[in-house]
From Swiss-Prot:
Catalyzes the condensation of the acetyl group of acetyl-CoA with 3-methyl-2-oxobutanoate (2-ketoisovalerate) to form 3-carboxy-3-hydroxy-4-methylpentanoate (2-isopropylmalate). GO terms for biological process: L-leucine biosynthetic process. It comes from the Bacteria. Residues 393-517 are annotated as: Regulatory domain. GO terms for cellular component: cytosol. It is an enzyme of class 2 (transferase). Keywords: Amino-acid biosynthesis, Branched-chain amino acid biosynthesis, Cytoplasm, Leucine biosynthesis, Manganese, Metal-binding, Transferase. Residues 5-268 form the Pyruvate carboxyltransferase domain. This is 2-isopropylmalate synthase. It catalyses: 3-methyl-2-oxobutanoate + acetyl-CoA + H2O = (2S)-2-isopropylmalate + CoA + H(+). It is found in: Cytoplasm. HAMAP family: LeuA_type1.
Amino acid sequence: MQNNIIIFDTTLRDGEQALKASLTVKEKLQIALALERLGVDVMEVGFPVSSAGDFESVQTIARHIKNSRVCALSRAMDKDIDIAADALKVAEAFRIHTFIATSALHVEAKLRRTFDDVVEMAIQAVKRARRYTDDVEFSCEDAGRTGVDNICRIVEAAIKAGATTVNIPDTVGFCLPTEYGNIINQVMNRVPNIDKAVISVHCHNDLGMATANSLTAVQNGARQIECTINGIGERAGNTALEEVVMAIKTRQDIFKGLDTRINTQEIHRVSQMVSQLCNMPIQPNKAIVGSNAFAHSSGIHQDGMVKNKNTYEIMSPETIGLKKEKLNLTARSGRAAVKSHMDAMGYQQNDYDLDKLYAAFLKLADKKGQVFDYDLEALAFIDMQQGDEDRLSLDVITSQTISNLPASAFVQVELDGKKISQVSNGGNGPVDAVYNAILAITDMDITMLHYNLTAKGEGAEALGQVDIVVEHKGRRFHGVGLATDIVESSARALIHAINAIYRANKVADLKSHKISQ
């Protein structure tokens, strides 16, 4: 049995399903390239049949990724499989992942078929996928609530049809570790041709068991773990990549000889990138990547750490690429110093625009005095999300709030190269007043669906990041703004979203013109 645990990352497929607004193709590619540097073996990057946008994303990522296998999901249907293959065909190496529900509840209530029908559909789907690639994965959806006899039967049939990986997912996070381990053990021992395929596991976290179930499965013979960065995913999320990887690495007394190809020093950086781009804050006490994961506030713990780090630290923060902050970046620091800090955090030159980052850094340093590594990181991420063709930009903003009176605001923006000013009175607070002014200037019909403020750093001069989701003509758009002033960061978030709307409208107009021709 192989000693390498295959890491199958599904952040861009299963993880993205949890987001309030879809990622752009550019953002998905940025994450995919980061996952490649992280060392994931397989990345599942979309469901091409679901939309033209998903097809484009899968195709774009497939074209750029060279060192990881690119995978796309499809139902056990010819159309799905053909479209997935079409999106993936430009890839250096690719996998088609096809699935069908196998639990009695799903078979009878959703599919309205017999289990015999389901087995035959699985066989035909695998055979169809094998026309395009010799790397085919088959999944038994809701295997956690499927009888073991039926799991073994359909797994054997799928392998015989040509599946090289068989996935036994706990789709609704129903299983406890002992149950799930037993399922994997029985599949290993009862399926006669199991030696011709890799057993994969895909666990959800509805009962908080995703990581435990995945690790128990490995102990019982599974050799692929399907997971996401930060555990993002539908409902309570998926198995967190960073948790299973670091558990295997840290507990070699249990997982003797087993390892992954993950470059663990990239974990912190990729975790932060996914959190920022997906607008999914990381809870402070999140294992491995939370801000408190390596914090020790108890006096007894601090004393022990000073004497010997191993007293309360089972892994080094440097192992996941977490560097200690330095307080020596000021407005007097040069470009080389900024680049040095970015290098120390693991960023490569093509991850960000140094000229733009340095200009933003100088503005922030003038306001804050000292600039921390996490400030640079936030500025770099925000810059990555800005479009090259922004029509709207913020110039001047002031707001005033007097007790028991509506808030007022003055906003000056540049729209298509022209400076436009607007005064707004009657706002329900300064942010509302500023938003009213911006919407009056742009004459944009927008519904605010989500507003979230996150502090980036510590103290009164911490950066405030505002993430919003707005709806315009039935579509959702994400905006993000960063500033030391909450009102300014809120304004920048709205302007970011409006620029996204302008670009979407421009694309729609171009498509409409092309069709009319």
